[in-house]
From Swiss-Prot:
It catalyses: [(1->4)-N-acetyl-beta-D-glucosaminyl](n) + UDP-N-acetyl-alpha-D-glucosamine = [(1->4)-N-acetyl-beta-D-glucosaminyl](n+1) + UDP + H(+). It comes from Caenorhabditis elegans. May be involved in chitin synthesis in the pharynx during larval development. Glycans are attached at residues 396, 1303. This is Chitin synthase chs-2. Residues 1628-1639, 1647-1661 have a biased composition (Polar residues). The chain crosses the membrane at residues 117-137, 177-197, 213-233, 243-263, 272-292, 302-322, 348-368, 488-508, 523-543, 577-597, 1046-1066, 1075-1095, 1101-1121, 1137-1157, 1159-1179, 1376-1396, 1441-1461. Its EC number is 2.4.1.16. Belongs to the chitin synthase family. Class IV subfamily.
């Protein structure tokens, strides 16, 4: 049954301003026609006549087509999202306005070049550092085990000890070897001790899971076997191996991983080949069990020990080589068990690490006992000096005498030097405190050191028994044909070598981890791990050959008796390669490379945590390279299948430049046609791995922003839209999986969006109209062409209204218009709106599967924005990286840069810089950030949905302090709730965003007046709950709580500190007494306090400006006073050191932030403003704590529109406190309203006017006529009018109108939801006339009604509640003001009194004493020529409290400076990880298709989807003319070309531009394809022939074989590509099968989209077709 539509005639661009009856629900056909943008001037909706439609909707009208008897639906092209409507343009209106210049999003060429150089240098440093440290660690460890094997052997050493002999030998005893045993044990135990410390720290300060008994016992058994295997290899086998063989054997430690790799292999096409290679690796690894003893006969005794130790060692890494996808069920079970073990490893290894150290000690004593006695191992001071006898054999008498003469000369020379130094030392020392002489001289004999006689000889006096005498030994012994030279070994050389070896291990681990974090794993980790053993073998074999040739080789680094074992390693390189042992080792090396092949294909995210990189929390000092390679996780990230990357099926009514039939079919294996998104949201209605895709909801809150501020925020959203569309197109059409892919949706919540017109109806205010006007400008600025977005859809909602825009990238932008009379306004309630809408309604209500809810919530993020923020997509990537890195991260914020003009903005630039450089960085490093600013922050949905977060955030402020804590600092309170629930908040310095800062003094003070009390209240709330916070939040320790307490105390005492500083500076600068200086400074401060407590806010701000200017001038005296103080006290005085430390820390921080170095320039303004900002501002904030108005961007309503609100009693929206300080405290309550609706007052005013006019008219014509009109008050009643039969018709009509309005007024008083709730006048506003009307889904409308009723209904307060609130706020103000002033006054008095009386009570500063040298005659000896020198030393005297607080502030500064250094290193890592290296890429000609597309997919998609130039020929594309000379601008030609182009439809969506270029690309066509400018072609990837061929081939593989036929009749700009012609034929059949859907009748057309006419034809007939 057909419904008759509105028959009012409308113009061509006229909108339907009428509204349907609220009680009448339109039927489907009517609503569908409206939803499609169709309008009928008369008649009814026709039935579906396919034949007639097909005839009448061709490219041109057929003359034989009969005149339709019923209206024909003409599609509303005005609402097509892909092209702009051709409006009627006058011939004279052709002058152009160029789009604004593009924003400078990057940092310039030199910045990018420096990042490239930095990344290259990092590649090189990491490679060398990891490889070098791994080689050093392994070599030095083998050196220690080789030294154990030298025990009891006589070795040949360098003949430099006894140079007269041809050969020097030494016999190493157990006393010489025992130190290397302990050194080896320490080298094994040090990493385990470090693991114990880390595990205990995590156990004590973080909330980690406790293992079950079975899990603990299982890990204990495995690690025990592993430790026994290490002990056998190190203490039993290695001492008997030469160095080269020992290094080679470390490649045979992956027998168990080789077996597990086979049984964990996932079945696939190449599984058979992979299994064959796996068995080959097993065979290669098992060869170490039998081959090594066979080729080395001396190892026959270790025939059993070698396979046992290697197998036990390889057990440790079993967790990394079992997979859940294995075909064997036991392996899958074991993999799940391993996953649970990883979650509980901290508490497990807190005990296991100590247990392993005990195992190492037992193995040491067990296996070394066969080489030496236990008594030798337990000797005292095993690392000390030991006597070593070096023998020179085969010497004749002449050589012996020459040796004796040389030694005696050396001894005499040593004695002379010892006596000289002893005499000099004795002269220096006081006579009563002579230390004991040490007669152990060091004698230099060539290049070694020798001690003779006694090591210690006690002096014949005191302390003789404290240092016992050691045995004496002769310097040398002479025999018949040889001599012995006795010398002491170097003390603690083994201990130093252990420290050096552990340092190399430590560096290797952290450089490897850093390489993995910054996405340099192949070059910085995998390659060094593969090369470490070959390089070590090469190094050791070279050293052995060199030692064979020269016995003195290496003695300049090592002691003469220390070197590697080189049994049979002195062969040449050719002989070494040809030995069977070398070939077996190469098999081990190849098998290890295959088993650790996962190192070359990392899949982890940037800056991944150690737990995500390594399976075990420890590494082995003996072979750190193998332990790290096997410990590196294989499965880092869940794989997202390409078919799960779903995209919306495109509707033909919403797509213009598409391939026929393609809109309902997606490319093969890229999109899934079986699923869609819920209500145009980002959540799919079926489970898939795509649930883990990052979803970003940008939620901005707006109020009274200017047009420039709105444009900045909108440009940021359009940048995100463009970036997301490029990534979507790259995946959709280029079949590339982008690891950084995300889905995006934008919401803007507009507070106070409505005004009330003269009829009491809501109408959109000037700010809403402003954003509607600037949205096209923002899009034009981003896309660098004149853009005109598709008109929005407008809908009436329970909270006001909603505008829905489709951005050029097909992402949606929702503008929610809030009516203060229907819903609470202000920023916190807007945040509650989108929390409940996006997380409560869309996620929790629409998704049924709980597991899906958890996955989606962990990967859904809300990007909170202010209405004036400006950012880039790269800044969002960095925050998302932090979120992916840490699952417990609840929020992340970036670096905020204030923008604007004026001195206040310059001050804030420096203030923001110091706050971020030092304070935020410190919070990030030692705990977590306390406040994530709402202007640019990323919140995790999972954290916001947790208990006591979103629900508590929606609480209504009941107590007076709630208004301060909850509503004045909503961002900080939300972060406080996250911290109390155990989530972490982080800061990323590389994520930049700009926001407009207050430019005026008053606005700045009002902003800080909100921030300071809310900050103090939230910190105090956190400190009160510190026990719970420390318990549940692993990022917050008791030390961080103490740090926050210290910062709170410093903030409270800040005004007093500045006050004392000014007093001292004035006193020193003007040489006046301290008390006089106190009076001078106190007068303006006291006056300001009195003004703040008594005067109006406007007068307070005037007083603050005046006094602040006076103190700024006095700060010049502070400069002079500080300089005089520094000169008087010296550079080592505490004040000087503090001043230098502050200046140095600021300058260093600026140098470490080179891109922000200019922020330090306004430091002078910051210095002059210190008294104003750190003394006056806190006083102003505390004294106005009861004032809870917003204070910034307040736009007072016009007087005529505010009259009603002022007359309304009890209405808290405007208040009446403009001149009453008592009521100033309630101005913020603009959400509330009284019992009388403002509309009632409007009606009363209009009724009064009507009655007055009627009375005047009546008195004029009928003076004797008695009238009476009773207009009751707004509390109730009706108007009663006595009608007279003598009244004429006009009078009767006026009376009836007045009566009708009276009755409506009475109804309004009974129901506050009267006409304002039903009115749709704002929908007919001129700014929205082109917008299409839509209606909310019933379910969504029900949601909004419920959430408003429960949480967001406007606040209604009666007089008593207002009085109670006012009294409570004033009481809080009074109490906190008293506390604040008393604490500072006590502090000031204490410091000043102690300063005055510091002669009596002081602390002497130990540094920088001053000396006064006086020479006076000495009369005691009656000799006038004798003079006496008097030295008087004076030290600086400090008052105790001043010194304590100086140390207090210095400690804070040191902590912040060190934390800033650590944070800068982390930021550097983040920048390096995010920087893409271009210089080593293959050239385009050398890249294969897959490599080309994979490396440049997003950039190619971004170039293909560019809107600029898409509708023009290559030679007609407008290039900017402002840089050209006047003679070359071609003004007339450009204007003519522009006029012609204005008559054409313009593509307005990125998808359509991409498809048009993508399907038109052909390597057979001209090198300048349609839509590309000939300018800068060399810089475009898509214009290169290699790129075009690769894209063409990729397109064919996705969409079918190309048809090479050309259509010469088609112009180059609209030429159909080969794929288009092919796809047209492929989808012809499907096109004929299209049927009407629930959204309305779809038009069937055989015409091609690119051949559509520029204007729709109209037919002549009785029915007039119109579009709206």
């Amino acid at each position: 049954m057909m419904n008759t539509l509105d028959h009012r005639p409308l113009g061509r661009m006229e909108t339907m301003e009428g509204k349907p009856d609220e009680d009448e629900v339109p039927t489907s056909s009517n609503s569908d026609a409206k939803g499609k943008g169709y309008y009928y001037s008369s008649g009814t909706v026709p039935t579906d006549d396919s034949t007639l439609e097909e005839k009448c909707q061709q490219k041109t009208f057929d003359p034989s087509c009969p005149t339709p008897k019923t209206p024909v639906i003409v599609p509303n092209r005005e609402f097509d999202p892909n092209f702009s409507t051709v409006t009627e343009n006058k011939g004279w209106d052709i002058f152009r306005l160029l789009p604004p210049k593009p924003d400078r999003l990057g940092h310039g060429f030199w910045h990018d070049a420096s990042l490239q150089v930095l990344k290259l240098a990092t590649f090189l440093v990491l490679f060398l550092l990891t490889l070098g440290s791994a080689v050093v660690a392994k070599s030095t460890f083998i050196l220690m085990t080789s030294a154990i094997g030298w025990g009891g052997q006589t070795i040949t050493i360098c003949n430099q000890v006894i140079s007269e002999a041809t050969q020097n030998t030494v016999k190493l005893k157990n006393a010489h070897v025992v130190k290397w045993v302990w050194a080896t044990l320490l080298a094994l135990s040090a990493p385990e001790a470090l693991c114990f410390v880390r595990s205990m720290h995590r156990t004590m300060f973080r909330n980690v899971k406790r293992p079950t008994f079975i899990q603990f016992v299982f890990v204990l058994i495995i690690e025990t076997f592993h430790s026994i295997g290490v002990g056998i290899l190190v203490f039993r086998i290695f001492p008997d191996l030469d160095a080269v063989t020992a290094a080679q054997l470390t490649n045979a430690m992956c027998f168990v991983p080789a077996i597990l790799s086979v049984i964990s292999r996932k079945p696939n096409k190449s599984a058979l080949l992979l299994v064959i290679i796996d068995f080959a690796a097993i065979a290669a690894q098992s060869s170490g069990f039998w081959a090594l003893p066979m080729f080395l006969p001396n190892l026959q005794k270790h025939l059993v020990a070698i396979p046992v130790s290697l197998t036990l060692i390889s057990l440790a890494w079993w967790q990394n080589f079992v997979h859940r996808d294995s075909v064997f069920p036991p392996v899958r079970t074991l993999a799940k068990f391993a996953q649970r073990l990883s979650e509980r490893r901290s508490k497990t290894y807190a005990f296991v690490s100590l247990w392993k150290i005990c195992i190492y000690v037992v193995c040491c004593f067990l296996f070394i006992s066969s080489r030496m006695k236990i008594e030798d191992m337990l000797q005292k001071d095993p690392f000390g000096e030991k006597l070593l006898s070096v023998a020179g054999h085969d010497m004749n008498q002449t050589q012996i005498e020459k040796f004796q003469l040389r030694i005696n000369q050396m001894i005499e020379q040593a004695n002379r030097e010892a006596g000289f130094y002893a005499a000099a030392e004795k002269k220096k020392q006081p006579p009563k405190k002579q230390p004991k002489a040490d007669e152990a001289e060091q004698v230099d004999a060539g290049e070694y050191m020798m001690k003779r006689f006694k090591r210690f000889i006690g002096d014949a006096g005191e302390n003789e028994e404290e240092e016992p005498e050691e045995e004496e030994f002769s310097s040398y012994n002479i025999y018949s044909n040889y001599v012995e030279r006795n010398q002491l070994t170097m003390a603690y050389d083994a201990l130093w070598l252990v420290i050096f070896q552990f340092g190399a291990v430590f560096v290797c681990y952290h450089s490897s981890k850093f390489a993995c974090k910054v996405m340099m794993q192949r070059m910085g980790f995998a390659l060094p791990m593969a090369l470490s053993v070959p390089v070590t073998v090469l190094l050791l074999s070279t050293n052995c050959r060199m030692r064979q040739k020269d016995s003195c080789y290496g003695t300049n680094v090592l002691t003469v008796e220390l070197f590697w074992q080189c049994n049979g390693a002195s062969m040449s390189l050719a002989d070494f390669i040809l030995t069977p042992q070398t070939w077996i080792w190469l098999c081990w090396l190849a098998s290890q490379f295959w088993i650790t092949i996962h190192l070359w294909n990392p899949k982890h995210e940037r800056l991944a945590k150690s737990e995500k990189l390594f399976i075990l929390p420890y590494y082995i000092g003996a072979f750190v390279d193998q332990s790290l390679a096997f410990n590196r996780r294989r499965d880092d990230k869940a794989k997202i299948k390409a078919e799960d990357l779903e995209f919306d099926a495109e509707d033909s009514s919403l797509t213009y430049e598409t391939i026929p039939g393609l809109q309902n079919k997606t490319p093969p294996s890229v999109c899934s046609a079986s699923s869609s998104k819920l209500e145009n949201g980002l959540i799919r209605d079926s489970a898939s791995s795509a649930d883990a895709i990052t979803k970003i909801y940008a939620c901005a809150t707006m109020w009274h922003e200017t047009g420039v501020e709105m444009t900045c925020m909108l440009k940021s959203l359009f940048r995100m839209d463009e970036d997301q569309c490029a990534r979507r197109n790259a995946q959709k059409y280029l079949k590339v999986i982008d690891p950084d892919y995300y889905e995006f949706e934008a919401h803007i919540f507009f507070d106070d969006a409505y005004d009330v017109n003269e009829y009491g109806e809501p109408e959109i205010n000037k700010f809403v109209k402003q954003i509607v006007n600037v949205i096209d400008q923002a899009a034009s600025a981003v896309h660098q062409t004149q853009m005109r977005l598709k008109p929005p859809k407008k809908a009436k909602t329970p909270y006001g209204g909603k505008l829905t825009y489709i951005m050029p990238g097909k992402n949606k932008l929702f503008i929610h218009l809030k009516d203060n009379q229907k819903i609470r306004h202000r920023k916190r309630w807007s945040q509650v709106m989108y929390l409940y809408y996006l997380l409560g309604y869309r996620l929790m209500m629409k998704v049924d599967d709980p597991s899906r809810k958890e996955i989606i919530s962990e990967n859904t993020f809300i990007l909170t924005l202010d209405g004036d923020v400006d950012f880039t997509p790269s800044s969002v990537y960095l925050l998302v990286d932090l979120m992916k890195k840490n699952r417990r991260l609840g929020a992340a914020c970036g670096r905020i840069h204030p923008r604007g003009d004026g001195a206040m903005v310059w001050y804030q630039k420096f203030e923001y810089a110091i706050g971020h450089w030092l304070q935020k960085a410190t919070e990030h490093m030692i705990g977590c950030v306390m406040c994530s600013p709402g202007c640019f922050s990323l919140f995790r949905a999972y954290a916001l949905m947790d208990d006591n977060v979103a629900r508590r955030y929606a609480l209504k402020s009941e107590e007076p302090k709630h208004f301060i804590q909850y509503d004045q600092g909503e961002d900080r309170w939300l972060c406080t709730l996250l911290l109390q629930r155990g989530y972490r908040v982080e800061y990323c310095a590389a994520s930049d965003a700009q926001t407009f800062a207050p430019e005026g003094f008053n606005e700045f003070f009002n902003q800080r007046r909100r921030w300071i009390p809310s900050t103090i209240f939230n910190i105090m709330d956190l400190l009160k709950d510190y026990r719970n916070v420390v318990r549940v939040n692993e990022s917050i320790s008791i030390w961080y709580i103490i740090y926050q307490l210290v910062m709170l105390i410093s903030s409270i005492l800040g005004p007093g500190t500045i006050f004392v500083m000014i007093i001292g500076a004035i006193s020193i600068s003007f040489s006046i007494d301290t008390l006089i200086s106190l009076v001078i400074v106190s007068i303006p401060v006291v006056v300001f306090i009195v003004v703040c407590l008594t005067a109006k806010p406007e007068h307070q701000l005037i007083c603050a400006q005046t006094i602040g200017a006076i103190f700024a001038m006095l700060m010049t005296a502070v400069v002079v006073g500080t300089s005089l103080q520094l000169q008087k006290d010296g550079l080592l005085s505490p004040h000087s050191m503090f001043t230098v430390a502050v200046a140095t820390s600021f300058l260093t921080a600026a140098i470490l932030h080179p891109l922000e170095f200019t922020c330090i320039i306004p430091g002078t303004i910051y210095f002059l403003a210190i008294p104003c900002m750190y003394m006056l501002l806190p006083i102003y904030s505390v004294c106005n704590m009861h004032t809870v108005s917003w204070g910034t961007r307040e736009d007072p309503r016009p007087t005529e529109k505010n009259t009603l609100a002022k007359k309304t009693p009890g209405n808290l929206e405007s208040g009446d406190g403009a001149g009453n300080s008592e009521n100033w405290c309630t101005r913020f309550l603009c959400c509330g309203r009284g019992t009388v609706h403002p509309m009632t007052m409007v009606i009363n005013e209009k009724l009064n006017e009507v009655i007055k006019k009627v009375d005047r008219l009546d008195r004029k014509h009928h003076p004797s006529l008695a009238r009476r009109a009773s207009i009751l008050s707004s509390t109730g009643g009706t108007i009663q009018i006595d009608k007279c039969s003598e009244a004429d018709e006009d009078e009767q009509a006026e009376i009836e109108d007045a009566l009708e309005m009276s009755n409506q007024s009475h109804a309004a008083k009974k129901n506050q939801k009267w006409k304002q709730a039903q009115s749709e006048a704002w929908l007919a506003d001129k700014a929205l006339k082109r917008a299409e009307r839509e209606y909310l889904e019933p379910e969504e409308e029900s949601f909004w009604n419920d959430v408003i009723e429960r949480y967001l209904s406007p606040l209604i307060m009666d007089g008593k509640d207002m009085d109670r609130l006012r009294a409570g706020l004033i009481a809080i103000r009074n109490s906190h003001t008293v506390y604040f002033l008393m604490i500072n006054i006590v502090f000031i008095i204490s410091v000043l009194v102690l300063q005055i009386h510091k002669d009596c009570l002081n602390i002497e500063w130990p540094l920088g004493p001053k000396f006064n040298h006086t020479v006076r005659p000495c009369y005691a000896n009656h000799d006038d020529n004798q003079k006496e020198e008097v030295w008087v030393m004076t030290r600086l005297q400090l008052e105790p409290i001043g010194l304590v607080f100086l140390i207090f502030f210095v400690s804070i500064l040191v902590i912040q400076f060190l934390a800033m250094l650590c944070h800068r290193f982390g930021t550097l890592a983040h920048i390096i990880a995010s920087t893409e290296l271009f210089c080593f890429r293959k050239t385009m000609d050398r890249l294969s298709e897959d490599e080309l597309v994979a490396q440049n997919a997003v950039e190619i998609a971004r170039e293909l989807q560019a809107i600029r130039g898409i509708d023009e020929n290559a030679h007609n594309i407008d290039n900017p003319t402002e840089d050209r000379g006047i003679s070359r601008r071609r003004v007339v030609q450009n204007l003519e070309s522009s006029r012609k182009s204005m008559m054409k439809r313009k593509t307005e969506t990125l998808d359509a531009a991409f498809k048009k270029r993508f399907f038109a690309l052909s390597s057979e066509q001209t090198p300048d394809p349609a839509g590309f400018s000939a300018r800068d072609n060399s810089k475009r990837l898509t214009l290169r022939k290699g790129t075009i061929r690769a894209l063409e081939h990729r397109r064919d593989s996705l969409f079918g074989t190309l048809d090479n036929r050309k259509d010469d009749e088609v112009d180059a700009t609209s030429m159909r590509g080969p794929a288009q012609r092919r796809l047209e034929r492929l989808f012809t059949a499907q096109q004929d099968q299209n049927s009407p859907t629930s959204d309305g009748n779809r038009r069937k057309s055989n015409s091609r989209p690119w051949d559509q006419p520029t204007s729709s034809a109209t037919s002549s007939g009785d029915v007039e077709l119109r579009r709206f």
